[in-house]
Curated annotation (Swiss-Prot):
Enzyme class: lyase
Native organism: Salmonella paratyphi B (strain ATCC BAA-1250 / SPB7)
Catalytic residue list: E83, E114
Induction: Induced by MurNAc 6-phosphate that releases the repressor MurR from the DNA. Repressed by MurR in the absence of MurNAc 6-phosphate.
Pathway membership, UniProt: Amino-sugar metabolism; 1,6-anhydro-N-acetylmuramate degradation; Amino-sugar metabolism; N-acetylmuramate degradation; Cell wall biogenesis; peptidoglycan recycling
Subunit composition and interactions: Homodimer.
GO biological process terms on file: 1,6-anhydro-N-acetyl-beta-muramic acid catabolic process; amino sugar catabolic process; N-acetylmuramic acid catabolic process; peptidoglycan turnover
Molecular function terms, GO-annotated: carbohydrate derivative binding; carbon-oxygen lyase activity; ether hydrolase activity
Keywords from the named record: Carbohydrate metabolism, Lyase
Domain (SIS): residue spans on this chain: 55-218
EC number: 4.2.1.126
Protein name per the record: N-acetylmuramic acid 6-phosphate etherase
Amino acid sequence: MNLGTLVSETRNPQTMDLDALPTPELVKRFNEQDTLVAEAVKATLPDVARAVDAAAAALKSGGRIIYMGAGTSGRLGVLDASECPPTFGVPHGLVVGLIAGGPGALLKAVEGAEDCQQAGEDDLVALNLQEQDLVVGLAASGRTPYVIGGLRYARQSGCTTVAVSCNPDSPIAREANIAISPVVGPEALTGSTRLKSGTAQKMVLNMISTGAMVKFGKVYQNLMVDMKATNVKLVDRACRMVVEATGIGREEAEALLKQTDFEVKPAILMALTGLDAAAAREKLAAHQGFLRAALEH
């Protein structure tokens, strides 16, 4: 492949004079380019929706969401995965981020790590990949061998696969069941795909993980009701969620949360139904953790 022909590697005619610009104009040019990202992502929403449903299906069948990428793409996957346990109360390891070169590559580039297809397969083998898992390959260029190797192995293993790339008709797209390709155009700094391409990938990952968790019963209305209240800020947020979802006063919300070890879902159910903590937990379990279903039935 001639990498110079990739959209993400071409020069941007709107930013040819970056080194000659005064600072206010410099940042204006970057901002102008960033405004293009949301529209590029918008064009992919039908494919993102398919990925959300696939991710939710994986979780409901006992599988995992596994992101894999190199460099910025890999770091974005690790970032999204690491935010899921505190935000949605899921165990570590339910959403996994793999980066070419291993954890050390998060802080320091591991040269050449992305160029090995076998490494992508090996990292999935080490995770004991199961067919219920969803594998999401991330590569701005769309041709990273590490990601191609991982996606190919995942499909051979019976997994549903998703490819996220910022170039059209990319090699990783051809390896996946679902291809998401927000084409953001040439970067302001030629080839620096940590810029618009990274932003687009982050937006897509936000929707995949958050959408899947909504479908997995981790959200009520627009509240993160399975959040772990592990610090002062989050305890306060838990109280506010109970107040906002039920209309009760803060003192009553705090009293209910103390009975549930600051678990928000049973506290809301208690406030709205009069159940005690044990009965609220039992009813939630009977509805697979979906608070709305527990309230309506």
